[in-house]
Amino acid sequence: MTREPILIAGGGIGGAAAALALARQGWPVRVLEQLREFGEIGAGIQLGPNVYKMLETLGLTGAIDATAVRPDALVMRDALDGEIVTRVPLNNAGFAKSFSYPYAVTYRADLHNALIDACNAEPEIELAVAAKVTGFTDSNDGVSVQLEDGGRIEGRALIGADGLWSNVREILIGDGPPRISGHIAYRAVLPATEMPKHLRWNEVV
């Protein structure tokens, strides 16, 4: 008897990681991504020891280490005068003894690509694009998911990983749209060779 899949709304980092974790436990999974292709928007992302433990469980440390950088330290500076507030050494013997796993930074797209590649290689996972979840109905036997194009998909359960403007969250919790904090963060990725020499340090600041 064919088991109905666990459905995941959203194929970003969270959705892909959830799909891979479930498939490794023997669950059939169907990822429903609203865009027409899988992709990740953003710049860098920090990978702490807790994340590396998860990556090891999923068998992804090799793929991540191929592109990630392990900085020497995490530095906090005063926003007004630039003075160092504290400096935390990383990836030394003491850090390894305390946390067992490393600390690294990588490009968000590289992390996402590694997850999607692993999902594509997993026979229990089906990746669907142009499949935006707009609603769902629970039942004793599972869940029926409504798509924007009018289609309907049956599954054992539904996981909402459809981002900041999540339709699943709005239906389930109904706490309104995200509130704007008034803060703006500017991010960019560029080759280290284009940085001024005095800024070419191997630290997260």
Show which residues each predicted segment covers.
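Glycine-rich FAD pyrophosphate-binding loop
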Residues: 23-43
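Glycine-rich Rossmann-fold phosphate-binding loop(s) that bind the pyrophosphate
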Residues: 10-12
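Flavin-dependent oxidoreductases
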Residues: 184-205
